[in-house]
Amino acid sequence: MRIALGIEYDGSRYFGWQRQREVISVQEELEKALSRIANHPVSIQCAGRTDAGVHATGQVIHFDTDANRAEGAWTLGLNSNLPPDIAVRWVKQVDEGFHARFSATARRYRYVIYNHNYRPAILGSGVSHYHETIDADLMHQAGQSLLGEHDFSTFRAVACQSNTPWRNVTHLCVSRSGPYIVLDIKANAFLHHMVRNITGSLLLVGQGLQPVEWIAEVLAARDRNLAGPTAKAGGLYLVDVDYPAELGLPQMPLGPLWLPDSAPGTTSF
């Protein structure tokens, strides 16, 4: 029997998603809790492996088990066995052919910036603090040149192991609400550090250090050395993973916190 779970977590104290020796990971904590509930060792697969310090409200995992448990055992039971910064949002039995990563058709991330002179004490690990003056409208304008299918080598980490740098970005919106700036981006898949590298480059435009047209120029150059720095991990959230509708997986509010599902000026997508 194959089970899919929707997971959210605060990644602040974890060394990323993937299980590693001698450091804590989100995968390790979930597998330990699942193994207790199932009464056998459990190995999980996820939709997207997040880096150290990165959060998720819409991570999806799957695992195989022959343990016959009610839905409440997987949700309430798991949440009582997980640390406070990891939680299950939903559970669904799926076909054996379902795969959390390979069945997905798109991923969506949000990057949350706290743009204020002084750092925040509340939610400090859930946002990235930038004190410089930032124009979110300029960031949004520049980001539109990234829409469509492109070679994103410029925004790819050196250690990225993907076979191809080509990705299809279907939505990118940058908006401001008071001191908070949110970059909302959706694509069929993402390269390692792609969202954080895009954010770091758009921030240079928002700070007036580069013109709007610069983003299109560095994208075409396919050279990581020409782009901006990698933005900090703390503001990044995996908020949604798309799957074919016939799978019937639950749809939950994206978040984080108060953020609406639709970006300003759009309908849901």
From Swiss-Prot:
Group of enzyme by EC: isomerase
EC number(s) given by UniProt: 5.4.99.12
Reactions it catalyzes: uridine(38/39/40) in tRNA = pseudouridine(38/39/40) in tRNA
Protein's UniProt keywords contain RNA-binding: no
Stored InterPro entries: PsdUridine_synth_cat_dom_sf (IPR020103), PsdUridine_synth_TruA (IPR001406), PsdUridine_synth_TruA_a/b_dom (IPR020097), PsdUridine_synth_TruA_C (IPR020095), TruA/RsuA/RluB/E/F_N (IPR020094)
GO molecular function per UniProt: RNA binding; tRNA pseudouridine(38-40) synthase activity
Residue numbers binding substrate: 109
UniProt record, GO biological process: tRNA pseudouridine synthesis
Keyword annotations of the record: Isomerase, tRNA processing
Pfam families documented for this protein: PseudoU_synth_1
The UniProt record lists the keyword tRNA processing: yes
Active site residues of this protein: 51 (nucleophile)
Subunit and interaction comment: Homodimer.
Function comment: Formation of pseudouridine at positions 38, 39 and 40 in the anticodon stem and loop of transfer RNAs.
Family label: Belongs to the tRNA pseudouridine synthase TruA family.
HAMAP family according to UniProt: TruA
Protein name from the UniProt record: tRNA pseudouridine synthase A
